[in-house]
UniProtKB/Swiss-Prot annotation:
A motif (Beta-hairpin) lies at residues 90-113. It comes from Chlamydia pneumoniae (Chlamydophila pneumoniae). It is found in: Cytoplasm. One of its GO terms (cellular component) is excinuclease repair complex. The keyword Magnesium does not apply. Forms a heterotetramer with UvrA during the search for lesions. Interacts with UvrC in an incision complex. The keyword ATP-binding applies. Belongs to the UvrB family. ATP binds at G37, T38, T39, G40, S41, G42, K43, T44. Keywords: ATP-binding, Cytoplasm, DNA damage, DNA excision, DNA repair, Excision nuclease, Nucleotide-binding, SOS response. Coiled coil: none annotated. PANTHER family: UVRABC SYSTEM PROTEIN B (PTHR24029:SF0). This is UvrABC system protein B. The beta-hairpin motif is involved in DNA binding.
Length: 657
């Protein structure tokens, strides 16, 4: 099946040329290209057109979950008849295993897996293995190790009507595929009822598989509603994929156990003069081996991943990228931020594991349960398009001149030319600008501060003046950041103050003023690239205005002014030539079910009275249901609050006994 693009508008401005050049580059085997597109020029629409033109399996890589979810929603709308999937880390909460030698403190791994995201991850791998019309939007989670595609596909169960499947062997196979027997219809489960077996695939929530038998002969396969089991479609055959990426064929498991034991013996010899570490590594690893023998799984099994893939020490881990065919298209969105993030992942992982291995908590093979290094990731960059308004030196060099500019905005709105005002007295001046915007135009304001503390203080100061304001920085969790952005667009707040508001991939047409405090403090967040990105946040509004509060013109400010003037003039010339009058962007407030906070959701609150045993048990059930619903809708922060409230109730319950 081919990609079928659905869009209510046709390419315009720079888009037709950008689409044609990028598509030709992919077809002509150009390894790296850059789409240098200004904010609001329709880069996502351009990429969607390229995907439809070249018709290749595609991975879109974003640098955070918020942006990934926005892109996922947009591509689903562009390709409603194709497999658009979502692949991010499935942890609502994750505390990695660690050992702090100076205090002799071992921290056990603690996590909470989001069931809905786990389903979407499995759906993504299933789609890319079955269909070429697959587009997966992913965070950098795609460079972390998961089970090998060879093991995953070898454990898939192919079912055909008319063939014999001894029931005891079939159910045993389902258990090996990480499906559990359960009378309740739930994901990754199966149930037997007389001559019928119902299977609830790990990667589906809308369909169940009903198998009917005559003795051991499979007589019918039906896709059914998972709750009512009303048939939807009868098929002659079906393929059921495993319930986990970490399934292990029996022959490979036996071989892996042998190599783990060999590594254990080597490590015990290494610790011969350190009895504590020797005893520790022996007991921990032996326990894991016994668990793998008995149930095919153990806690922390990913630390033995090299043994299950048969790879040599130091070899790259298998990851989502290995599930794609050789000719896949890679789109790296906001590449100026995503590429540095890929570089950073490996170093942080290795430093944490060093002490675990050194003190006998893990075998050295645990080092190979890791993300790809940047150099390893580059081997997958066979057909890549870097997308950014401010591409870095890496992308420019890699593309060897294959840079496609997309400066023209379909709306006709030119880049606002920044005004430079003194940093002395900047808060008072900004306050006047805010009041002017709110009293006359009811428009929104972004303020860029130099520190988190200043952002928090500024938000508090404005709130005291009865100006609805909030701050946004890295200390706020993903889902809460998303809610704050929604609040800004919907009018709950009018002013948003942050340190690095670039990282959100902000698409806020209501913002008409961007004010950058201390713009002359040269550095990472006041570089040319950052300043241009900040300016772009006001370029979606017809009344867009940018103010740099600076006592001197730094080199970054001067370069930003020159580049802004260049882009502005291109847009103005285009508008004049085509008689275009700038018009505002009318965009619905983002209603992605993955991120949207339900209006009827309940916030966990402290009880106003002592609770009885029955009250606490009822509260636990309520919070668990709310947690699961919030997690299913990707409201991560809310889910975590419900989890904490549920845990608090459980702890209170203990004191009643």
């Amino acid at each position: 099946m081919t990609f079928q693009l659905h869009a209510p508008f046709a390419p315009c401005g720079d888009q037709p040329e950008a689409i044609a050049r990028l598509s030709a580059g992919v077809r002509n085997q150009v390894k790296s290209q850059v789409l240098l597109g200004t904010t609001g020029s329709g880069k996502t629409f351009t990429i969607a057109n390229v995907v439809a033109n070249v018709n290749l399996p595609t991975l879109v890589l974003a640098h955070n979950k918020t942006l990934a979810a926005q892109l996922y929603q947009e591509f689903r709308e562009f390709f409603p008849n194709n497999a658009v999937e979502y692949f991010i880390s499935y942890y609502d909460y994750y505390q990695p295993e660690a050992y702090i030698a100076r205090s002799d403190t071992y921290i056990e791994k603690s996590l909470l897996i989001n069931d809905e995201i786990d389903k979407l991850r499995l759906s993504a791998t299933r789609s890319i293995l079955e269909r070429r019309d697959t587009l997966i939007v992913s965070s950098v989670s795609c460079i972390y190790g998961i089970g090998s595609p060879e093991n995953y596909t070898s454990m898939a169960l192919v079912l055909e009507v008319g063939k014999e499947y001894p029931r005891n062997i079939l159910t045993a196979q389902l258990v090996k595929m990480h499906y559990q027997a359960s009378p309740i219809p739930q994901r990754s489960a199966f149930r037997e009822r007389g001559s019928v077996i119902d299977i609830f695939p790990a990667y589906e929530s809308e369909l169940a598989l009903r198998l009917e038998f005559l003795n051991d002969t499979l007589t019918s396969i039906e896709y059914s509603d998972p709750l009512t089991m009303i048939p939807k479609e009868s098929v002659p055959s079906a393929t059921l994929y495993p319930g986990s990426h970490y399934v292990i064929p029996e022959a490979i498991r036996e071989q892996a156990i042998r190599t783990i034991q060999e590594e254990l013996e080597e490590r015990m010899a290494f610790f011969d003069d350190r009895p504590i570490e020797k005893d520790r590594i022996f007991h921990r690893t032996t326990h894991d081996i016994e668990m793998i023998k008995e149930i095919g799984f153990c806690k922390g099994i990913e630390n033995y991943s090299r043994h299950f893939t048969g790879a040599p020490p130091g070899a790259p881990p298998t990851c989502l990228l290995d599930y794609f065919p050789e000719d896949f298209l890679l789109i790296i969105d906001e590449s100026h931020q995503t590429l540095p993030q890929i570089r950073a992942m490996y170093r942080g992982d290795q430093s944490r594991k060093q002490s675990l291995v050194e003190y006998g908590f893990r075998l050295p093979s645990a080092f190979d349960n890791r993300p790809l290094t940047y150099e390893e990731a580059q081997k997958y960059f066979r057909k890549v398009i870097y997308v950014s308004a401010t591409p870095g030196d890496t992308e420019v060099q890699e593309s060897s001149g294959h840079i496609v500019q997309q400066i023209i905005r379909p709306t006709g709105i030119p880049d606002p030319m920044p005004e430079i005002r003194p940093a002395t007295g900047q808060v008072d001046d900004l306050l006047e600008e805010i009041r002017l915007r709110l009293s006359q135009k009811h428009e929104k304001i972004l303020v860029i501060s130099i520190t988190k503390k200043l952002a928090e203080d500024m938000a508090g100061f404005l709130s005291e003046l009865e100006i609805p304001a909030a701050y946004l920085h890295s200390g706020i969790e993903t889902a809460e950041r998303t809610q704050i952005l929604t609040d800004l667009r919907s009018g709950v707040i009018d002013v948003l103050i942050g340190v690095n508001l670039l990282r959100e991939g902000l698409d806020l047409p209501e913002v008409s003023l961007v004010a950058i405090l201390d713009a002359d403090k040269e550095g990472f967040l006041r570089s040319t690239s950052s300043l241009i990105q900040f300016c772009g946040r006001a370029a979606r509004n017809i009344n867009g205005k940018v103010i740099f509060y600076a006592d001197q013109k730094t080199r970054s400010i001067e370069e930003t002014l020159r580049e802004t003037e260049r882009r502005r003039q291109i847009q103005l010339d285009y508008n004049k030539e085509h008689n275009i009058v700038p018009k505002p962007i009318i965009k619905a407030i983002f209603a992605n079910p993955i991120l949207q906070t339900s209006k009827d959701s309940e916030s966990p609150k402290e009880s106003q009275r002592p609770l009885s045993k029955e009250d606490l048990e009822e509260q636990i059930k309520k919070y668990e249901a709310l947690m699961q619903r919030a997690a299913k809708e990707f409201r991560f922060n809310e889910a975590a609050k419900y989890r904490d409230a549920m845990q608090a109730c459980k702890e209170q319950l203990l004191y009643l006994f």
